């Protein structure tokens, strides 16, 4: 058993070196057309280093087994099978390989296809808009929203109450209170309780109201009659004064002065004397 352990320990470092060499050769196969000379020189140097390490490890003296049996061979074959299965299922690439693959993927792009340059054209004729004009639409939107809110808040009932309040101010103090009471009732206040009066007292109140109304009517009629009489006296005096006043061009035949011939008024010397005398009398 001790001999088998020694064989396994001796075979492990050599097998690991061989596997590393195989993996590196697999990744190095198949050179692309766009590889540069620097990359090729790097690969050659790495190959030389790997070969030197493998040769050094192979040159080291290994402890030879006394009598290799079937058990040792089976253990070695099973070990290599496990390694192969692990490599096939999940091949773990070394840290150096991704850098090489990225370099390979970048070099063909530089050689075969160039990046497209993007050019922006700014014409001199177009005037750049100031920031104030850009801010105006936002301000206009806010104003429109404020107007909409004000329109929505407008209420017909409030407007009606304000108009009613303004109309009450035109009346006297006595009537203002009555109208204010009616407005309060309209808004939902409780109306005052009805006052109950005896039937006989109510009839007396109605009679007093009627008598007061009749007296007011009589006084108004008397004042109207007195005014009418004054107007009639003035109108009669005016008529009399108009009749007594002499008129030169009156419609009567006796008062007519001169004669008309072919549309012209012809005055005699007697007519001229009458006209002059009437002016002196005035």
UniProtKB/Swiss-Prot annotation:
- Spell out which residues are annotated as carrying Phosphoserine: 67, 75, 268
Where it sits in the cell: the answer is: Chromosome; Nucleus, Nucleolus
Q: Where is this region: Disordered?
A: 27-98, 121-143, 208-254
Keywords annotated in UniProt: Acetylation, Chromosome, Nucleus, Phosphoprotein
**Compositional bias (Basic and acidic residues):** 48-59, 131-143, 208-226
**Sequence positions bearing N6-acetyllysine:** 173
Q: Which GO terms describe its cellular component?
A: chromosome; nucleolus; small-subunit processome
Q: What biological function has been recorded for the protein in this entry?
A: Part of the small subunit (SSU) processome, first precursor of the small eukaryotic ribosomal subunit. During the assembly of the SSU processome in the nucleolus, many ribosome biogenesis factors, an RNA chaperone and ribosomal proteins associate with the nascent pre-rRNA and work in concert to generate RNA folding, modifications, rearrangements and cleavage as well as targeted degradation of pre-ribosomal RNA by the RNA exosome. Prevents helicase DHX37 to be recruited before post-A1 state.
Name of the protein described by the UniProt record? 40S small subunit processome assembly factor 1
């Amino acid at each position: 058993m001790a001999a088998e352990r020694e064989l396994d320990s001796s075979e492990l470092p050599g097998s690991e070196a061989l596997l590393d060499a195989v993996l590196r050769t697999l990744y190095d196969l198949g050179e692309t057309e766009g590889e540069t000379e620097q990359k090729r020189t790097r690969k050659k140097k790495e190959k030389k280093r790997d070969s030197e390490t493998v040769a050094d490890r192979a040159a080291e003296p290994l402890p030879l087994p006394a009598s290799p049996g079937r058990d040792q061979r089976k253990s070695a074959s099973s070990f290599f099978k496990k390694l192969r299965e692990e490599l096939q299922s999940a091949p773990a690439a070394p840290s150096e390989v991704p850098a090489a693959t990225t370099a390979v993927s970048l070099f063909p792009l530089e050689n075969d296809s160039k990046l497209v340059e993007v050019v922006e054209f700014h014409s001199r004729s177009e005037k750049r808009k100031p920031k104030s004009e850009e801010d105006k639409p936002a301000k206009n939107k806010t104003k429109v929203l404020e107007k909409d809110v004000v329109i929505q808040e407008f209420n017909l009932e409030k407007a009606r109450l304000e108009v009613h309040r303004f109309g009450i101010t035109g009346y006297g103090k006595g009537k203002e209170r009555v109208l204010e009471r009616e407005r309060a009732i309209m808004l939902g206040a409780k109306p005052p309780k009805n006052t109950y009066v005896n039937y006989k007292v109510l009839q007396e109140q109605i009679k007093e109201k009627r008598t007061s109304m009749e007296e007011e009517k009589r006084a108004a009629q008397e004042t109207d009659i007195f005014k009418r009489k004054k107007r009639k006296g003035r109108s009669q005096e005016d008529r009399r004064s108009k009749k007594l006043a002499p008129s030169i061009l009156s419609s009567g035949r006796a008062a007519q002065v001169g004669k008309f011939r072919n549309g012209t008024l012809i005055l005699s010397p007697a007519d001229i004397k009458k006209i002059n005398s009437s002016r002196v009398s005035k």
